[in-house]
Regions:
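Conserved class I S-adenosyl-L-methionine
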Residues: 1-47
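SAM-dependent methyltransferase
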Residues: 143-214
Length: 252
C-alpha cells in the first residue's frame, strides 16, 4: 500500500472529503440498526486518511481508532480531531492495512473511498482481512467498499480543478491488459507564504474479482458476508460486477 506525501495529504484534506460526508450518516444508520450495534461503541477506521469519516463517529460518541500508512494523512487526522484526541476518545496509528495488530477489539470496522483497492495484490487483501478479523469483536461488523472492474474501466479521463488556492490536474487510466487503474494527480498548491508548491502523486487501484473477495472473507473466518449498495447496506445485490462501486458487509 502506498504512503502518500505531504502535499497530496494537504490536497486530500481540502478537496476530497465529500465521500466521507456522504457515507458517514449511512454507515451510522446501518450500524445502529444491526443487532447489538448500539452497544458496541468502538470503531476502527481502516485507511482513515485525514480523519473525516472518523469525525462522524466521534461526534456521535463512539471511541475511534484510525489507521493509515501515511504519516502526513495522520497528521491532518490528528489536527481535525484534536479535541477528541486530547480526551482519549480518538487515536490515530501509523500501520499497513495489509498486516497490522492492535491491543484492543472493535464492534465496527470500516474502510471507505476504495481504500482497499490500493492494496497491491490478492495476498495483501487477504492479509488485511485476517488482520481485521483478529481485532473485531465476536458479532462485530466489517464494512468496506471496492471499485469494481466496470467502475475502474471508466477511469480513462482528465479533470482540471483551477482555483485561487490550488490548480489540480487529475488524469485517469485503466490498464486493459493488466489488473490496475491509475490516477495521476499533479498541480500546484498555495503555501502559507503565498508561493505555490508543485506536487505530483500517482494513485493506483487494483482490480479484484468480487466473487473472490467474498470467498476470501469466508476463508478468513467471517460467517455472514453479503455485497450491497451504499444506500441499502442491509440488502444483498445479486450482480456486484455490474456496479461501479460496491460495499461488502461481513459479520464475525
Amino acid at each position: 500500500m502506498q504512503a502518500y506525501g505531504r502535499a497530496f495529504a494537504h490536497v486530500y484534506n481540502k478537496r476530497w472529503t465529500g465521500f466521507a460526508h456522504r457515507v458517514g450518516p449511512l454507515l451510522l444508520e446501518f450500524y445502529a440498526n444491526t443487532t447489538g450495534g448500539e452497544a458496541k461503541q468502538s470503531v476502527l477506521d481502516l485507511c482513515c486518511g485525514t480523519g473525516q469519516l472518523a469525525l462522524h463517529f466521534l461526534e456521535q460518541g463512539f471511541h475511534v481508532t484510525g489507521i493509515d500508512l501515511s504519516e502526513h494523512m495522520l497528521q491532518y487526522a490528528g489536527e481535525n480531531a484534536s479535541a477528541y484526541v486530547e480526551t482519549g476518545q480518538a487515536q490515530f496509528v501509523q500501520a499497513d492495512a495489509a498486516d497490522f495488530s492492535l491491543d484492543r477489539q472493535f464492534g465496527l470496522i470500516v474502510s471507505t473511498f476504495d481504500a482497499l483497492n490500493h492494496l497491491e495484490s490478492e495476498e495483501a487483501l487477504l492479509g488485511c482481512f485476517r488482520s481485521v478479523f483478529a481485532v473485531l469483536l465476536d458479532g462485530g461488523i466489517f464494512v468496506f467498499d471496492l471499485n469494481t472492474r466496470a467502475g475502474l474501466m471508466r477511469w480513462n479521463n482528465i479533470h482540471i480543478d483551477d482555483g485561487e488556492e490550488a490548480m489540480i490536474v487529475t488524469r485517469g487510466f485503466f490498464d486493459g491488459q493488466g489488473s490496475r487503474a491509475y490516477t495521476r494527480v499533479s498541480g500546484f498548491i498555495r503555501a502559507a507564504n503565498g508561493q505555490y508548491d508543485r506536487f505530483e502523486e500517482t494513485v493506483y487501484n487494483t482490480v479484484f474479482d468480487m466473487a473472490w473477495v467474498r470467498d476470501a472473507l469466508l476463508q478468513a473466518g467471517w460467517r455472514d458476508v453479503h455485497v450491497a449498495q451504499l444506500d441499502a447496506l442491509a440488502a444483498p445485490i445479486a450482480e456486484p460486477e455490474m456496479e461501479d462501486r460496491v460495499f461488502f458487509v461481513a459479520r464475525k
